[in-house]
């Protein structure tokens, strides 16, 4: 197995919970609480929409995941959890 030249040890100082997406337990919310307004982008594993929470009229971003392996979805969710609150993250 080859070793990455860049950021090979990036997770060494992080706790296992930060990078272990296979152990992630996903808590799915209620889909009926949200309404899609318009499409804002797409990626390899999902399409991204501007949305609204119908319970409180708050704007939100809705990421609709494409049908891919559960492992890839868990990895995507873990990355988004780690990015939450960062710069330019909605």
UniProtKB/Swiss-Prot annotation:
GO terms for biological process: inflorescence development; photoperiodism. ATP binds at residues 40-48, 63. Keywords: ATP-binding, Nucleotide-binding. It holds the Pfam family Pkinase. SUPFAM superfamilies: Protein kinase-like (PK-like). One of its GO terms (molecular function) is protein serine/threonine kinase activity. The keyword DNA-binding does not apply. InterPro entries: CK2_alpha, Kinase-like_dom_sf, Prot_kinase_dom, Protein_kinase_ATP_BS. The keyword Iron does not apply. Belongs to the protein kinase superfamily. Ser/Thr protein kinase family. CK2 subfamily. The Nipponbare allele of HD6 contains a premature stop codon, resulting in a truncated non-functional product. This is Inactive casein kinase II subunit alpha-2.
